[in-house]
UniProtKB/Swiss-Prot annotation:
GO (cellular component) term, any one: ribonuclease H2 complex
Species this chain originates from: Cytophaga hutchinsonii (strain ATCC 33406 / DSM 1761 / CIP 103989 / NBRC 15051 / NCIMB 9469 / D465)
Gene name of the record: rnhB
Cofactor(s) for this UniProt protein: Mn(2+); Mg(2+)
Binding positions for a divalent metal cation per the UniProt entry: 19-20, 112
Co-factor: note: Manganese or magnesium. Binds 1 divalent metal ion per monomer in the absence of substrate. May bind a second metal ion after substrate binding.
Annotated protein name in UniProt: Ribonuclease HII
Principal subcellular localization: cytoplasm
EC number in record: 3.1.26.4
Amino acid sequence: MDMSLLSFHSEGKIEAGLDEAGRGCMAGPVVAAAVILPPNYKHSLLNDSKKLTIKQRELLRQDIIRDALDYHVAEVSHTVIDQINILNATMKAMHKAVKGLKKQQPNLLLIDGNRFKQYTGIEHVCIVQGDGLYLSIAAASVLAKTHRDSLMERLAKEHPEYGWDVNAGYATEKHRLAMETHGLTPYHRTSFHFKPKQLDLF
């Protein structure tokens, strides 16, 4: 059985895959990436992106940046998240990622998840678990995650108690205990609530 991811959703369209990283985190920004891949693009690692090691993901990031027809990674800060809520902040990050595409203008956006706010009249399709179905979304997932992980590793040097170099700001036990012991840093989201809904907005 062929488990390869799909190269396109609608033949003849210029498709940009979109995904985010950090939606369910207690600290740091939400990051979104938009990627336009060449037609019929294939990459062996991208077919198994959920099982990648950190080293493989970094190598894949370099290949995507080299091979993509266009890509852009965008951040929305924790302060903006607190102002407009995480769902709106995620949409804002995705819109910024699409706006940042300069070499190619997509006419179809493939969105990982089941919600998206229309962007400047460009057609879009929401696909639950799309990073496991379409190469462009999987590529966007890799770029968003590696960008955000790198950022959180840098912030971890300022606040090593919270383990952000390992947990990337997610609500792990170590992170929660550090918050109880040391309080909030300037990078924490004050709007975060420890509720399952926070992690299931899509």
